[in-house]
Amino acid sequence: MRVVIQRVKNASVKVNNKIVSKIFFGLLVFVGFSINDDEKDIDWIARKILGLRIFNDKNYKMNFSVLDVSGELLIVSQFTLLASSKRGNRPSYSLAARPENAKKLFDNFIKRLKKKSGLNVASGIFGSDMKVNLLNDGPVTIIIDSKNRL
């Protein structure tokens, strides 16, 4: 499971030219699931996201988590995070979870974040062609892979 986390002032997702979700301050999280991911990966990544101290304190030191600042989360599925470009110029997505498995993991991930955080957790529409609009704050961008926890 791989996530790209961006601290944002606001972010939104459009599908078919209609805004389907929006946050005003918090974290935009792009998430991709691999063929070997399970509930342990979801738990670990959810804890990491909620505990990451990447919001500034009064001295502009990154000292607060999204929980500390009562931010929001916008979760967007992105299987291309599992791309491999080792061979040739066309990325391979053979490490990405099959859509039916990834959808279950995506739904469980959102439920887990809502349960653990109590924050507003918005999401894109899994499998849709989405247009993501965001205003980076910093910018602060963090990449986490659950396979690196071992």
Where are the regions that the model predicts?
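N-terminal, polar/charged subdomain of small-to-medium soluble alpha/beta proteins
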Residues: 1-88, 92, 100, 104-150
